[in-house]
């Protein structure tokens, strides 16, 4: 599963995955970003422009809002089924 970052937005914004799924975040933007869960259950750390980061979805099902900690207007939801 992959989430892309471009033009200061996540694509897709909302994503549904299985528990423990591996998710790759590709930063296709011209500046650094993060993808960080509101409850801190996952966090890519800073992803520089043109780079990627991978994380595991939580083991517990539910909805996990996330945002970029550098640009908090960027947000979405990871749903674990």
Predicted regions and their residues:
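Extracytoplasmic copper-binding redox domains, predominantly the cupredoxin/blue-copper superfamily
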Residues: 1-81
